[in-house]
Amino acid sequence: MFHVKHLYAMGRARTMTKKLLMGNEAFAHAALEAGVRVVAGYPGTPSSELIETVAKLHDDGAARGIHVEWSTNEKSALELLAGASYTGARCLFTCKQVGLNVASDALMSLNYVGVKGGMVLFVADDPGPISSQTEQDTRRFASFAKLPVLDPATPDQGFAMMQAAFDLSERYHTPVIVRPTTRINHASTFFDVADATDARPVPDEGFERDPKWVIFPRRAYQAHGEINERLAAIAHDFAV
């Protein structure tokens, strides 16, 4: 059973250093410590610093075994990550709230297909707005897409939720949204973070040919019921 207490009990047996980090920098470290292997997204405030941090750590040799990129757009990024997830790799998607509109076509089908390697969608909302066209609330989008959302109130919560989201995704074979807001993304506080990380290895079997990776109407009919059951199970686990 996945319990909410797991959000605050993530074991990390590495050499650690205390650093003053912006929220987005901390989210990057959290994902790397969780073993993320493929990171892709499209830039836009307040989300951009996450991928910039991952790329810098990779260039410095502190984030080993990963692929990180700015994609052509949000839809391309999510489709790339879907393929990586089907091999068992842990994947992280990043965008700002309006960017999720661009990825929505892939996202709606992806939830019906499901995932293998943990897939986390880091979608930064911008109440205000401070740097966006709209105040779009990703929680409404997630309800429409029938996806679980972890909604941190502080950078510390966000760090823990980012790590836990990968486990939640793999346990229930669903993408999971982590939804910080501008004040969380750009707040700074101290974190104990790993000096170096390694991406989690892809399972030996890698990608396996299976009809479930292709969503046709008959499969979609079955998957819709499975999604409803999955959400009920997640809600129950977080309620006990």
Q: Model-predicted segments: where are they?
A:
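Intrinsically disordered, low-complexity regions
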Residues: 4, 99, 212-213
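Thiamine diphosphate
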Residues: 10-155, 160, 181-184, 198
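Flexible, low-complexity linker and terminal segments
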Residues: 13-24, 152, 156-240
